[in-house]
């Protein structure tokens, strides 16, 4: 049992509508909108990812973000790892899912942008646990399409598999990532 109620998913039509994309874009500070080069902006509260380049919108996707207690970190980061056909390691149990296919929790692509080696105390749904060592946050696909639009992950940003494939092809190591509340 989670210690708090999970936020409801954003209505699917709102998450997918071009109006919500334009509202998200308009809500950005001008210096973010006009930043040179290609960069990713994650609007965590809107559960929306934007890929901008020289002030132009290149891609926009609905996403899932971290659940209460596992919030996706905010701040300025950069892509430091890209993996085609990643291996998933459960952040609590250490269980590895190496086989690729429809059940891999990371989908077909992984794009890492944040690493935290301070450890943390977090709730796993049933109890409080302590995680020692490093955790990495990134963008990845999901076999669970129903999760997109919700705050439901362990901190990572989930996209539909077809969307993470497109994003993977558009970013490189060093691409700037800004995560806003």
Label every PLM stretch briefly:
Residues 1-181:
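N-terminal pre-domains immediately preceding structured catalytic cores
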């Amino acid at each position: 049992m989670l210690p708090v109620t999970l936020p409801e998913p954003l209505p699917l039509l709102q998450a997918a509508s071009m109006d919500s994309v334009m509202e998200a874009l308009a809500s950005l500070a001008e210096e973010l909108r006009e930043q040179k080069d290609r960069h990713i902006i994650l609007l965590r509260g809107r559960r929306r990812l934007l890929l901008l380049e020289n002030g132009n919108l290149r891609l926009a996707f609905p996403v899932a973000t971290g659940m209460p207690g596992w919030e996706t970190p905010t701040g300025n980061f950069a892509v430091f790892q890209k993996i085609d056909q990643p291996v998933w390691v459960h952040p609590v149990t250490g269980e590895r899912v190496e086989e690729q296919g429809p059940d891999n929790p990371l989908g077909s692509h992984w794009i890492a942008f944040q690493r935290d080696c301070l450890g943390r105390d977090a709730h796993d749904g049933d109890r409080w646990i302590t995680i020692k060592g490093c955790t990495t946050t990134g963008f990845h696909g999901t076999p669970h399409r129903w999760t997109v639009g919700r705050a439901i992950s362990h901190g990572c940003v989930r996209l539909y598999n077809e969307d993470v494939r497109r994003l993977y092809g558009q970013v490189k190591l060093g691409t700037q990532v800004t995560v806003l509340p």
